[in-house]
């Protein structure tokens, strides 16, 4: 069975609840970390069987933070330019450029 993901690598997204801007750096077809705690969002089997995303976001000090989010937790980001989060714009553009022009190996 093929699972389709809504978001792609290099795409900018927003956390639905917290509003943080982030960039997708990897996609898992389903939850793939250790067994979650019962009170964790990942304990929901419906969410665990849907795509999960490795997303880089910035904390309140502007430092990059790696997060692991369910597809239900993020939404599309319509703008490609964010003056207050220009490092996320740069990361997104860098990833997309690398995907479009992969390096050849010898």
Curated annotation (Swiss-Prot):
The identity of this protein, by name, is: Heat shock protein HspQ
Q: Where are the compositionally biased (Polar residues) regions? A: 90-100
Q: Which Pfam families match?
A: YccV-like
A GO MF term: DNA binding
Supply the SUPFAM superfamilies for this chain: YccV-like
Identify the species of origin: Proteus mirabilis (strain HI4320)
The biological processes this protein is annotated with in GO are: response to heat
Subcellular location, record wording = Cytoplasm
Q: Report whether Signal shows up as a keyword of the record.
A: no
The residue stretches assigned to a coiled coil in this entry are none
Which InterPro entries does this chain map to? Hemimethylated_DNA-bd_dom (IPR011722), Hemimethylated_DNA-bd_sf (IPR036623), HspQ (IPR022866)
Q: Does the keyword Cytoplasm apply?
A: yes
Per the record, the major location class is cytoplasm
| Similarity comment text for this entry | Belongs to the HspQ family.
User: Which NCBIfam families does the UniProt entry name for this protein?
Assistant: PRK14129.1, yccV
Keyword line: Cytoplasm, Stress response
Q: Looking at the record, which segments are called Disordered?
A: 80-106
Extract one GO cellular component term from the record. cytoplasm
Q: Report the protein's function.
A: Involved in the degradation of certain denaturated proteins, including DnaA, during heat shock stress.
